[in-house]
Structures are given as structure tokens and as C-alpha cells.
Amino acid sequence: MYKYGTVVDPAMTTNRRSRLSGFRCASTARVTATLLLSFLAFSPSSASSDFGDRFHDDIVLPPGPVLPSAPEIPEPAEHTFSLRHIYHHGTHLHPSLHRKRDVVHEQSRVYLAAEDDFSEYDILRLKAKSRPEPIHRLADRRPSVVDPMVAESRQRGYAAVLDASAWTMDQVSSPDIKDKDTVLTLALMTANAYVEHDTDADWEDVGERWNRSADFGWESDGLRGHVFVDDTNSTIVIGLKGTTTAVFDGEGTTTNDKVNDNLFFSCCCAQQGQWTWHQVCDCATGTYSCNNTCVVQALREENRYYGAARELYSNVTELYPDAQVWLTGHSLGGAVTSMLGMTYGLPVVTFEAVPEALPASRLGLPVPPGASAEYPQMRENTGTFHFGHTADPVYIGTCNGATASCTYGGYAMESTCHAGYECVYDVVADKGWRVGIGTHRIRSVIDDVIKKYDGVPECKRTPECRDCAQWKMYESNGTETTTTSSPSTTSTTRTRTRTSTCETPGWWGCLDKTTPVTTTTSTTSSSTSTCKTPGWFGCKDKTTSESSTTTTTEASPTTTCETPGRFWGCRDEVEATTTAKPGQVTNVPVTAAPTGTTDDSLSTALPETQRCLARNWFGICKEWAIDDLEFATDEM
């Protein structure tokens, strides 16, 4: 490159330009920064804020954990289920027992057992539809996290209070309760839970090793659950065994079911009710006064069905960790599945379930912020649906009267409120049914209700329902078995002083000798004799005359009745008598004095008298005869 006759190296020129360019850029940046800071010092605060936002946007944060994205809303789908496993968990006699038996469809026959008028029903493959349902539940629902929380609530006596961040509102794949076939399928799964022997396959231990020498009778104690799985292993249904209704104890799980029923669904352990109720604790301290702390302690023992159901669910989820779980049950099994669903946030469909809001309030179940732990029926988005009809006294909460079948069997069913939604078939109005315990059976619900209706009923919540309104529930410190609670009242004691003591009391008074009593009245009377022969209603002595202004003296008759009547009256001949009244003079006939000689002509004729010839049935004379009385002077 030439400049004014001088040769210049192009590389040197390029380097110089680069240095000058870098110098100019650096100087310009410093000047611009100085002017910008001066401008911001005199600008409004909003400008400073905008600068701060731009400044933070330029900061590069270090890499952190990847936050989970919002779960996708499940699409409606159709599932085909088959029975895969049967679980059995001990409760009372064998609390550590937990066994499982697999069902092989090529070798096993799955059926509903015959019941009364219903024959056996084979179950091959069951179809059901699903739909998304919002459920407010814990974000971390693993049994290893939830179970210690529930155990702590059981020890403290109240539900755990969790932050709102621990809860989430999820769209969960749930049974389509508006589809009749889906409801029928779940009912069949519930009915199948009553079948105890499907195959002759051996049971395998799930929990600790079971002593084979004590193998006799274990099937009569515990909770039975049947597990249905769809073809893709993505959805499973657990059907829990309900109450085996019986009047007297002894067969199967009847005794244990009765104890759990009366713990769960009575106001105060079946006390102060009907004399046939099976009492299961002693927590009542007065008339309709109950120590709720005592009831809670009796209800939360781990050898009850609720604890067994949680452990059964834990083992099933270990076998299918990624599957969506549905719960179903009938009667007591339906109530237990509802409480299990509220614990882990699972979809639940029950049939003729006993109202379970009362025991749910005593178990210390986790509740979301803003919900009432005392009234679970007020919770929203629980994902629980209770199907039943109006002719079932257990479902509608009226099986507690003196003549009710539940009372006759020893069951105290006093609860009336369901948590979640109620789907009621009004068979009383639609079909003219009468309320009776016979309609409570699941086979009757399947064949006579669900299959007979063209659709399904509308499901509604009942948040205004209340249990045990007449009872006064109070809490104690839990150190005593029972506590007596009496309100402070002011009472007035009346004292009566007696001036005499009765030595011989009678039925209606005192039998002692009477004493003269003086009163302030103007008339004074006194008795001149005492009672020597007291009787039941008075004195048997002859009455004495009392002084008065008019004295009347009556002469006692000198004759007695020789011929009494059949029932009353006297049949003797009537003699004429004359009664002299005061102030009246009666002329008495006077006869001449007798002389020494006797003459028949001196006989005096007396007045005529009447004589009864015939009398009637009551002794009254019907026919009279008149006779002349004659007498001789020598008779005088």
C-alpha cells in the first residue's frame, strides 16, 4: 500500500485499525454507562425497576431440578377387567396374617354364589368405562408417607394440619358413574367379594410367615379383598368384603363385623339404645352424654378393618405401582372403601354402604385446607359415589328402631350421613316397595334395581346432614376411661317437719289411734271413742254419735233376716213399724186391762198385713197376699 510515496504494510494497517476500533468501543461504553447512571439518578422509580428487571433477566442461573409438568387430563376409555388375585388380611384373632391367592382363568371358575332366590352367576370378563373426575388429594400419597401421618393423628386424637402446598387438585381417571353398564360391572365385582372359594389353589403368605400348625379357622377372621385388573395392567379395582348379616354370633366373620359396625356407626358404642344392641365400649357418662375421646380410642385400634384395609391397599400397590386404583364395596365394605378413598385420594363407588361420615370424623383422616374434619359430608371433590335405594333401611339410616331387623340382630346403625355423593334409586315411589332389610342384599340390588332401571340416578351431595343430633359429645384428656360431666345448677332443698311419728303405717295412711285435732273453724267436733279394729280403708269399730243441734235416735231392729234373697234383699215378711219424728205425737191404741175372767170376745183385731206369694230373680216380690193378724190375750 502506498501513502505519499511510502510503502505501508497492509497487515500493520489492519492491526492498527483493530486497536483503534477496540479503543473507541471501550471508551464509548464507559461514557454511555456514566450517562445512563446519571440519567437513572434523576429518573422515576419505575425506570429503576425496569432496569432491575432487565438486569436480572441477563443473569444466567445454575442448572437445577426439573419441575414436573402439569399432569395430562386422562381421556375417556373402555376397560376389560378380570379377577387376578384374592387377598385376605386378619383383624382380630390373627392380626399379623396376610395371604394372597392368584386366580388362573384357565383353571378357575369365577362366579357369584347362589343366594336365596338367586342362582349362581358366572363371571368371565367385565367391561367398564372411565372418565376424568376432579379429586382434591395429597400430592404425595404413598402409603409410606400417609400411614405414619394417620398413626400420629390417631395418637394425638385430631387430624393432621397440612399446608396448602401439600394438596393438589387432580383430574383422575375414574369410573363413569353415568354409564349403566359400568355401574353394573362394579356391582358384580362387589358381589363377587363374598365368594370365599374360587379354586383349590394354595394361599401364599404376603406378610410374615404364617404358622401352618395354626391354620385352622383363619378364614373366619379378617378382611377379604378381590383384585380385578384390566388387560393393560393400567387400572385395577379392589372389591372389599362387607358384613355377613346374621342375628346371632358364631358363623364366619359375623361377630367381628358386628363389633366393627357398632364401633363405626353408633353414636356412643351402642349404649343407651335398644336392649338388644351389642355394646362394644363403655363411654357414655350420662343421659345422651358421651366421652368422644373414649370412643375415638376404641375406634382407632389397628386390629380393626380400617387398618387392615390400608395394609391390603399397600400390598396391592406394591404389585401394581403404576396402575390407577378404583375401590368398590357393599355394606360395611363400602364404608371402609370410602374411608380408604378419602385417605389416599382414590375414586370410590359403593353399593348400599352404611353412612360413614360419623366414623370418618373420628379416625383422624387427612383433610384439605378449608374443609371440616368434624363433618366429612361437607367436603367437595372426594371422588366418592354411594349407590343405594330408598327401601334399604341401612342405606337411608333408619335401621335403629325397637322393631328394626338391625336392632333385633344386635346392630346399632345410628349414622345417617354419607361423605361424597349419594346416587339414590327411589324404588318406594317408583315400584311401591316397602322398607325392609331383605332389600339390602347385593344380589337384590343387582337383579331387582340396577338391571330393572333404564339408566342411573342423579348423584347429589348432602352437606346439611348431621349425625347424633340429640347427643352431647365432649372431649377429655384421655387419661381416664370415662369422665362424668355435670353442668353447674342451683337446687333448692325443701324440708318438712312432722310433730308426730306414725308407729303403725298403713297403705293409705297411719293406723295409730287418732288424737283430737283443734281447728280454727267455728264448728267443733270431737270423737268420744278410739278405733280398736282398723281396716284397709278406715275403722271397723261401731260409729259413735256426735253432738249436734238436732238429735235423732234410731232404734236398731230387734229381728234379723231369716230368708235372704238370691243376691240382695230379704225375703222375710214385712212388719209394719212406726217411727216417731221430733215434734210429732203418735196416737197409740190403748187396750183395757185384763180381768180375772177370760172371754174370747175380748180379742182385739190388728191391722191387715201383706205377705209375698212370688218373687222374681232379684228377690223383689211380684205377688202379694193380705192376711189378718189375730192373737189371743193369753199370748201377751
Curated annotation (Swiss-Prot):
What the entry lists under InterPro entries is as follows:
AB_hydrolase_fold, ATG15_Lipase, Fungal_lipase-type
Q: Where is this region: Disordered?
A: 478-500
Question: Among its keywords, does the record have Plastid?
Answer: no
EC number(s) given by UniProt: 3.1.1.3
Sequence ranges on the Lumenal membrane side:
43-636
Under the heading SUPFAM superfamilies, the entry gives:
alpha/beta-Hydrolases (SSF53474)
Q: Does the keyword Nuclease apply?
A: no
Which reaction is this enzyme known to catalyze?
a triacylglycerol + H2O = a diacylglycerol + a fatty acid + H(+)
Gene Ontology biological process terms, A to Z: multivesicular body membrane disassembly; neutral lipid catabolic process; phosphatidylserine catabolic process; piecemeal microautophagy of the nucleus
Q: Kindly state which keywords UniProt assigns to this record, in alphabetical order.
A: Autophagy, Endosome, Glycoprotein, Hydrolase, Lipid degradation, Lipid metabolism, Membrane, Signal-anchor, Transmembrane, Transmembrane helix
Q: What GO MF terms are annotated?
A: phospholipase activity; triacylglycerol lipase activity
Its record classes its membrane topology as:
Single-pass type II membrane protein
- GO cellular component terms listed in the entry, alphabetical order: multivesicular body membrane; vacuolar lumen
**So which stretches are on the Cytoplasmic side?**
1-19
Any idea where this protein resides?
Answer: Endosome, Multivesicular body membrane; Prevacuolar compartment membrane
- Spans through the membrane: 20-42
User: What is this enzyme's class at the first EC digit?
Assistant: hydrolase
Q: What happens when the gene is disrupted?
A: Significantly decreases the radial growth of colonies under nutrient-rich conditions. Strongly reduces conidiation. Strongly reduces the production of deoxynivalenol (DON), an important virulence determinant.
UniProt biased composition (Low complexity): 479-500
Question: Which positions are glycosylated?
Answer: 211, 233, 291, 315, 477
Q: Do you know which PANTHER family this protein is assigned to?
A: LIPASE ATG15-RELATED
- Subunit structure and binding partners: Binds to both phosphatidylinositol (PI) and phosphatidylinositol 3,5-bisphosphate (PIP2).
Function (record text):
Lipase which is essential for lysis of subvacuolar cytoplasm to vacuole targeted bodies and intravacuolar autophagic bodies. Involved in the lysis of intravacuolar multivesicular body (MVB) vesicles. The intravacuolar membrane disintegration by ATG15 is critical to life span extension. Autophagy is required for proper vegetative growth, asexual/sexual reproduction, and full virulence. Autophagy is particularly involved in the biosynthesis of deoxynivalenol (DON), an important virulence determinant.
Q: Which family does it belong to?
A: Belongs to the AB hydrolase superfamily. Lipase family.
Protein name per UniProt: Putative lipase ATG15
| Gene this protein is translated from | ATG15
